[in-house]
Amino acid sequence: ENRGDGSLDQTADLTEKHVSHGRSSENRRYFRSDKEKHLGGKCMKKKVLAALMCAAMTVGMLAGCGGNSTAGNSSSDAGEAASGTESADSGAGRREMDVEGDDVTTLEVWTFIENHQDFYTNMAEKWNEENPDKKVKLVLSNMAYDDMHNKLSLALESGEGAPDVVDIELGKFPAFMTGDIGLKPLNDAVEPYLDNVVESRLQLYSKDGNYYGFPTHVGTTVAFYNTEALEAAGIDYTTIKTWDDFKEAGAKYKEATGKPFAACETTAQWTLNLMLAQKGGDYLNDDGSLAVNNDTMVECLQTMKDMQDAGAMDVIAGGQPDNEEAYPLYNSGDVAAAIMPFWQTSRYLSYMTDLSGKVAIAAPPVFGDNDAVKTIGGGGTGTAVVASSPNADLAAEVFAYIKLSDTANVEVWNVLGFDPVNTAVWTDKSVTENPDNQYVQYFNTKPFDALLDVQDGIGLLTCYTDEKMPSINNIFCTETLNNIFESGMDVKEALDEAQSALQNEFGE
């Protein structure tokens, strides 16, 4: 998982199939790792591993902790971890703030990304400076991703041992929205910032009109283009406005270079989820029942399949752009474009250093003027307050400041490279165009120009908040997308298989 709230890393590392069905060996060299050239009997092993993981995730959901999300619902925060660059930390770590004074409230905070501890501590220090009569001392515990979410589930169920404040990854959040919700509604704390915060990001962590999580960033899905590679192939990225334009440019690039233009994702759904939202679709019906084989889903996946057939998309190593196997392909210029959440900026700086000054950020392609939305947010980590905390009201006020205030969101951009959820920052050119900022220096366009282009059209898939999503993500990223883009299965047939499997799992 890429929890760089970023993000949930949408990677399903169980399946290593990166061979594009029907591709020549010459083309495969761009997206096959050496260890994958002899698949042989590995296919069966992969299917067994995928099945075991699916079963394990189901058990996890029954235990009340939710499954690991994979696709575009994941977190990107500290790195968002990877995504932000957030790769979830594997071990526990504990630290305490050193706060002077007699009237100081201690808040226990759980995280699964160490970078979040740094950010929260720095912002709590600013809070204490501005609010000397309401000082807080954060005691932060960082745990492995699954360990922390499982521990939280048990603590809320037993009524003992829960923290005051906790980070909950987007893919896990729905599991904490069922039954007696143990988290505090945050509406009052959010209210002072509501006018400037991207509403769709608050909705990710909401139920029945109540907000239960403070978002870390927007994760606006944008397009990243290697302008040097495209110009050499005679392509002007600024002419790419629609998916038809994207397809035409991709086919031209493939013909000119023999290299992939963009990723046909098999271990994530960044592009699919964007298209689905633009078409006004979803994975579920309005009543919450499964509908992964609906007509809109078929249309979107067929659009991607047609792009693959035209040479505009290819299956790449790692199955998606945000993967350690894929970074070298982008860094070397072997793949020219990526449709990804904005937090991918941090990946470029960390893993694609050779592209400094060669990458443009643009609004993503659309189908047309009648699209339901222009883009969506991808990934996320919601910071929640435990309802039973004796300091719940103060904790909510403090963390609303830490996550939503102008001051905090300037640092979200400067330090983490994420697109701030508080859009007041988006128009502050002293921040967004600061020549000393490492992200401003890296990209050859102004990063926030793309965000401003889509500011009035940032939507979401409502299914993100449903407890079925971890299972849906899992089957798409281990079976369905591979069946379509690697095995050449008919789109409707592959989706019907997924629908049947999920209906069996949930008894529908």
Regions found by a protein language model. Give the residues of each.
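A structural signal for short loop-to-beta-strand junctions that line the ligand-binding cleft
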Residues: 155, 163-166, 193-229, 260-261, ...
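Extracytoplasmic/periplasmic substrate-binding proteins
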Residues: 175, 274, 302-397
